[in-house]
Amino acid sequence: MLYSKDGYSWKDLDTVLLRPAIGSQKVMRDPSMVQGPDGVFHLVWTSSWRGDKGFGYASSKDLIHWSEQRFIPVMEKEPTTVNVWAPELFYDDEANQYIIIWASCIPGRFERGIEEDSNNHRMYVTTTKDFINFSPTRLFLDPAFSVIDAVIVKRASKDYILVLKDNTRPERDIKVAFSDSPLGPWKNVSKAFTDSYTEGPSVVKLKNEWLIYYDAYRKKIYDASSTKDFIHFESATNKVKVPEAHKHGTIIRVKEKVLKQLLAEYKP
């Protein structure tokens, strides 16, 4: 876990907060976290590269003590599902529910295009109010190309942005789409605002601009772009400072006391 006082310069707690205990491969990739109105932090993650029909889940009140990990089988009714990648949490404060989106590949379900059937992803969604009962899984986004790593951003009521990775060759880059609802439909998918071979976006609002972090995996850096309108983008590479070997995370704001407790517990 990293922490920052300004959203640009980051420091490493240099400790393991949680070790994966569920999933067929027991990995913990692509973590996404939100804090609910009751103060509880909810965390989801990719639990296996391939084979699993769901993702991992755990919760915490302080980011130090964690609940028992659970496996959420969101694609269990689709037996040919290849994978469940990068579940992303969004708290819808108008509907008072959590939205979870992720990328899955179901061979033969969509036009193959230039991708192999086992890499032809679309985004799916479920909603929950309590992380016990979940709405039926449904298609969230089909932009007519393989898409992964999507993130919902709220600018205002009826004004939402979806930051997404075009996972087709030779793209492998990040784009945006627009909607008046966090559940879509999404329209006007943009041209890429990053170079190719980028993925895992995370978005944070900082004063008069939005900062979009992403993994530039060919460059082997955690890169960033800035925007004020999600139409015009500028490189923020020289604005940010991220410790090496970090990628595809989530940025959330926490109260000062939460950070102080973490620093006292782990003493970086």
Can you annotate each of these PLM segments?
Residues 1-268:
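Carbohydrate-active catalytic/glycan-binding domains of CAZyme proteins
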